[in-house]
C-alpha cells in the first residue's frame, strides 16, 4: 500500500514542475487537484453500486469533461467551476470563487487523464488520505507558498493526541484547523484496532458529530474540507459540515466541546487593513471586545487562549501550541497566565525544540490545561515542565523530528494517570528534562512568568556550534519587539 501511495504522490506531484514554469504555485496546483479529484470521485459515486445523488448538475460532470482536449477541455473546466461555485451546501463551499489556474491545456489534459485512471472511491480512506496529506506536506515545504504556517509537524500532533486520549462520543474542536491535521490524528487514534472497537452509533458520531473546526483562510479551508472528506469525516452530500470559514475570534460560537487540540497561527498581532483619507492602505491592530474574555488585547495568541477557555466544557481538556511570548509577556499576558492558574488546571508545558516548523526560528511550547468548575480556590497546584528544547536540534530535511523523539515526553506525561508522575530532574541529575514546579513558585516569579529553563545550554559555551543565524536573528528581533511593547505599555500607564 505504501508503494502504491508514494507512486501516486510522485505522479501527481511530477505534473507540478512544468506548471511552475508557467507561474502556477504549489498552492494553486493543490487547489486545482482538489477540484479535479472531487469531480472524479463524484462521478464514481453517481454510478453503480453507489448511485448517489451527488448534486453535480447535468452537463458539468467529470464524464462531460474527461474526454475533451485543448480549448474544449479548458472551456468545459472553466464552465464547470463557475457552475459548481453557484451550488449550495458543501459543494458550493469547496468550489467558491473557483477558477482555472492551469493555462496550459496540454498539461491540464495530462492531469485529467492521470486522475481518470485511478479508482478513488474504491481506494481505502487511508490511501486517499495519505496521498492528500503527502501533497499538503509538499505544499508546506514550499517556502514561497507560505503554506507551512498551516502545517503542524505530524509527530507533534500525534503526541498531543496520545496525551489527551480522546474517547468515543466526545467532541473535539480546533478553532484554527488549517488542513485538518489534529482531526485526522484524533480519528486515527480513536479507530486504532483494539483500542475502542466502536459500535455503529459511535462510528456515525465520529463521522458526523465529533469535530468542530474553523479556518480563516479560504484556500486552506477548501483543502481542509477535501482532506476531511477523503478521510471519511463529514458528509459532502448532506448538511453536516464540520468546518466553518471566518474569523473564529469574533464571537462565541455557542458550542462547548470535550477537547481542544490546536496550533494557532504564528504572529503576535491581529490586524486589519484600512484605507485612510489619502487613499493609502494602513494596518490597524484588531482588538476583540468579548464579554467572555478576561482581558481585551490585540495579541492573537492570548485571544486564542481566551477563546479556547470559552468553548471548553466545564470538564474539557486542551492541548495548545503557543509561542514563547505567551509565557512571559507583561500586561494582558500576565493577567491571562494568572487566570489560567486560578480557573483551570494548567498542569503541563512541553518546551518545543527549534527547527520543527516551516517558519524559521520559531520558539514554541505546548500548554496542556483542564477546565474546572467555578471555585474560589486556585485550580492549578503543580506545573510539570518538559524541556525538549535545550541541547536538542532538529532540521526539516536532514534531521526531522520523529514519533520516537517524543516517546520520552509521553512516558513522563503518563497519560494513563497523570497524577502518578516522577521527576527526572534532581539536584543530582541537573540535566533531567522533566521537572515539577508548584503554583506558589510560579506566582512569585516576575510577571508570573512560565518561561522556565534549568538545563545548561551547551551551544552557548561552544563557539563552533552556535545556533543557526536565522534563529539568532529571530531571537534578536523578538527581544527588541518585546522591549518596545513593554516601553509602550509603560508610556500608556504614565499618561493615565
Region roles according to the model:
Residues 1-168, 232, 237-248, 351-355, ...:
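Non-catalytic, mostly N-terminal accessory regions of nucleic-acid modification and defense proteins
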Residues 29, 216-221, 294-369:
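Conserved Class I SAM-dependent methyltransferase catalytic core
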Residues 146-262, 267-274, 278-280, 290-292, ...:
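Conserved S-adenosyl-L-methionine
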Residues 271-299, 324-332, 353-359, 374, ...:
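Short, contiguous acidic/charged loop-to-helix segments that flank catalytic cores in large enzymes
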Residues 224, 263, 285-286, 308, ...:
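Conserved RecA-like P-loop NTPase ATPase core
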Amino acid at each position: 500500500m505504501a508503494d502504491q501511495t508514494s507512486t501516486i504522490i510522485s505522479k501527481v506531484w511530477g505534473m507540478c514542475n512544468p506548471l511552475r514554469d508557467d507561474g502556477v504555485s504549489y498552492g494553486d496546483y493543490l487547489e486545482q487537484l482538489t477540484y479535479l479529484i472531487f469531480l472524479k470521485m463524484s462521478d464514481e459515486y453517481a454510478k453503480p453500486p453507489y448511485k448517489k445523488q451527488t448534486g453535480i448538475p447535468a452537463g458539468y460532470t467529470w464524464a462531460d469533461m474527461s474526454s475533451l482536449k485543448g480549448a474544449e477541455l479548458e472551456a468545459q473546466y472553466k464552465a464547470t467551476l463557475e457552475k459548481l461555485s453557484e451550488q449550495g451546501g458543501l459543494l458550493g463551499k469547496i468550489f467558491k470563487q473557483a477558477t482555472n489556474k492551469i493555462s496550459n491545456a496540454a498539461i491540464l489534459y495530462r492531469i485529467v487523464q492521470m486522475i481518470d485512471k485511478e479508482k478513488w472511491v474504491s481506494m481505502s480512506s487511508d490511501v486517499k488520505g495519505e496521498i492528500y496529506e503527502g501533497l499538503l506536506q509538499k505544499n508546506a515545504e514550499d517556502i514561497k507558498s507560505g503554506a507551512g504556517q498551516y502545517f503542524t509537524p505530524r509527530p507533534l500532533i500525534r503526541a498531543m493526541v496520545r496525551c489527551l486520549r480522546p474517547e468515543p462520543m466526545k467532541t473535539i474542536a480546533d478553532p484554527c484547523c488549517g488542513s485538518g491535521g489534529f482531526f485526522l490524528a484524533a480519528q486515527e487514534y480513536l479507530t486504532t484496532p483494539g483500542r475502542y472497537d466502536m459500535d455503529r452509533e459511535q462510528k456515525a458520531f465520529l463521522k458526523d458529530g465529533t469535530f468542530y473546526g474553523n479556518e480563516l483562510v479560504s484556500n486552506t479551508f477548501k483543502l481542509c474540507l477535501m482532506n476531511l472528506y477523503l478521510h471519511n469525516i463529514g458528509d459532502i452530500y448532506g448538511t453536516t459540515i464540520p468546518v466553518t470559514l471566518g474569523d473564529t475570534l469574533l464571537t462565541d460560537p455557542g458550542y462547548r466541546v470535550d477537547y481542544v487540540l490546536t496550533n494557532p497561527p504564528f504572529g503576535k498581532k491581529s490586524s486589519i487593513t484600512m484605507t485612510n483619507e489619502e487613499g493609502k492602505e494602513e494596518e490597524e491592530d484588531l482588538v476583540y471586545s468579548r464579554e467572555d474574555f478576561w482581558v481585551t488585547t490585540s495579541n492573537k495568541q492570548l485571544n486564542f487562549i481566551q477563546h479556547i477557555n470559552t468553548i471548553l466544557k466545564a470538564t474539557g481538556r486542551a492541548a495548545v501550541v503557543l509561542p514563547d511570548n505567551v509565557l512571559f509577556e507583561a500586561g494582558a499576558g500576565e493577567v491571562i497566565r494568572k487566570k489560567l492558574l486560578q480557573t483551570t488546571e494548567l498542569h503541563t508545558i512541553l518546551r518545543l525544540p527549534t527547527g520543527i516548523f516551516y517558519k524559521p526560528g520559531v520558539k514554541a511550547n505546548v500548554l496542556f490545561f483542564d477546565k474546572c468548575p467555578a471555585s474560589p480556590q486556585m485550580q492549578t497546584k503543580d506545573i510539570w515542565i518538559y524541556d525538549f528544547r535545550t541541547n536538542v536540534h532538529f532540521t526539516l530535511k536532514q534531521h526531522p523530528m520523529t514519533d520516537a523523539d517524543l516517546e520520552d515526553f509521553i512516558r513522563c506525561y503518563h497519560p494513563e494517570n497523570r497524577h502518578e508522575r516522577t521527576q527526572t530532574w534532581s539536584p543530582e541529575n541537573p540535566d533531567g528534562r522533566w521537572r515539577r514546579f508548584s503554583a506558589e513558585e510560579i506566582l512569585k516569579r516576575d510577571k508570573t512568568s512560565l518561561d522556565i529553563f534549568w538545563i545548561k545550554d551547551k551551544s552557548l559555551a561552544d563557539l563552533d556550534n552556535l545556533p543557526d543565524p536565522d534563529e539568532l536573528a529571530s531571537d534578536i528581533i523578538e527581544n527588541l519587539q518585546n522591549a518596545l511593547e513593554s516601553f509602550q505599555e509603560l508610556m500608556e500607564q504614565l499618561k493615565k
